[in-house]
């Protein structure tokens, strides 16, 4: 339902102020949209790279799959997949807070160097790398999701400003301006007619004297 606009000088002033605010804020929104588009592209590349690293780490650990069941290795192998802590933080990108991983700490695996196979170190290193790469891949996807959502929201606002708010406000201003102009012309005409009537009355009065 359309909002009823008062065709007054005060309404004209308010709508003019509104249009000025919209036109001032639109370039800022457009700049943010451009920055977000660039950051989304970077985030897409980063997510793809992290996912690739995770797949490669998975393939490396898969090569040891048959060795996981060896009794001497079971406990330390299981430990190598356990996360002790994740140092998360946030950074501001184009006005948006996105997560970032500073460090992933896993529980240390204790085992006897003499009582375990020589390849165990390599396998444990590969398993830890898999866990870290998985965390990094998940966070990179979350970063991408947040940036894409913000870009969508900003794009909607830019479109709203350009296609609706600014054109509608401009249209309202023109409508009020035309009305006020017509009324001004009418008022001037009425004043002139009133003056003529007064002059005619005076002229008739002079004739009667």
From Swiss-Prot:
The gene is atpD. It comes from the Bacteria. HAMAP family: ATP_synth_D_arch (MF_00271). Belongs to the V-ATPase D subunit family. Keywords: ATP synthesis, Hydrogen ion transport, Ion transport, Transport. The keyword Secreted does not apply. PANTHER family: V-TYPE ATP SYNTHASE SUBUNIT D. Pfam families: ATP-synt_D. This is V-type ATP synthase subunit D. NCBIfam families: PRK02195.1, V_ATPase_subD. It comes from Chlamydia pneumoniae. InterPro entries: V_ATPase_D. Produces ATP from ADP in the presence of a proton gradient across the membrane. GO terms for molecular function: ATP binding; proton-transporting ATP synthase activity, rotational mechanism; proton-transporting ATPase activity, rotational mechanism. GO terms for biological process: proton motive force-driven plasma membrane ATP synthesis.
């Amino acid at each position: 339902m359309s909002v009823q606009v008062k065709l007054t000088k005060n309404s004209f002033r308010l709508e003019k102020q509104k249009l000025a605010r919209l036109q001032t804020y639109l370039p800022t929104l457009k700049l943010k949209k451009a920055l977000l588009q660039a950051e989304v592209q970077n985030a897409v590349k980063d997510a793809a790279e992290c996912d690739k690293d995770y797949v490669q780490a998975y393939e490396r650990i898969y090569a040891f799959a048959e060795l996981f069941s060896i009794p001497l290795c079971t406990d330390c192998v299981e430990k190598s997949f356990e996360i002790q802590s994740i140092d998360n933080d946030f950074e501001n990108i184009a006005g948006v807070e996105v997560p970032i991983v500073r460090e992933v700490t896993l529980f240390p695996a204790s085992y006897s160097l003499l009582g375990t196979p020589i390849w165990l170190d390599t396998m444990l290193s590969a398993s830890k790398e898999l866990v870290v790469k998985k965390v990094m891949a998940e966070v990179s996807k979350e970063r991408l999701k947040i940036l894409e959502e913000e870009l969508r929201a900003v794009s909607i606002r830019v479109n709203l400003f350009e296609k609706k708010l600014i054109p509608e406000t401009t249209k309202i201003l023109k409508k009020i301006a035309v009305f006020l102009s017509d009324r001004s012309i009418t008022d001037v005409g009425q004043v002139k007619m009133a003056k003529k009537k007064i002059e005619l009355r005076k002229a008739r009065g002079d004739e009667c004297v």
